[in-house]
Amino acid sequence: MEFLNQGDQASLLANTSNEHASLMLKQPLAWSPLAEKQTVKTIVHQTPKQTGRPSEPDWTVWLDKVRWVFGYGSLIWNPEIPVVRGLLARVDGYHRRFCISSTRYRGTPEQPGVVLGLDRGGRCHGMAWELVAGQEDLALKTLWAREMRNGAYRAKLLKVKLPSGECLNALGFVARREHPNFLRLREDELLRRLAQCRGDRGSNQDYLANTVHALQHHGISDQKLQQLLKEVQAQRSN
């Protein structure tokens, strides 16, 4: 797995023009209280079945709003979008939870897996990724095809807090409790899915393990996920 740590960031800046690097470091990380109110209702529409792609208005409306993306699960260890740097960040009012059914990436229609969502309450530590200027359209297209395929998430600008105390606006994908794919699994069923299910992108156990290891790499301790991983590994070894 590749991570954008401080060494990577220094290397990236060293290979960037002095003018561009200076601009990246001096730009304000501004947050507006209006950000949390901004959601786009068109995003809840289902992906057109004939193309398998999200409709353009779903992501183009964000082009002038999004400079940062908040990752709390696989977007930490596999963002798949052009980014300049990643910063440790925290979102209040939401927590990371296995609450979204996965019938493609980590499961199948016959054996659905489960992936993470931002659910109401608590707080969530993750990564804020700064998008490469001029490539926002590519980043958003990629994110919509990946995260918004079945409408189980709602795209929302979140107030993201940095360790420095600064705040910024970041696009996040929040679980939609009203969606059929939103789950409230019993612990035994959650463990079963994590231990047994597999989809186009690999096993559910790998998804969990990669997330735990990525969080630890960045100095984030999620004890709930760490305990889940221990129990899943124990279940698989029996």
Name these PLM-found stretches.
Residues 2-238:
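A glycine-rich, hydrophobic/aromatic-adjacent loop/helix-cap motif
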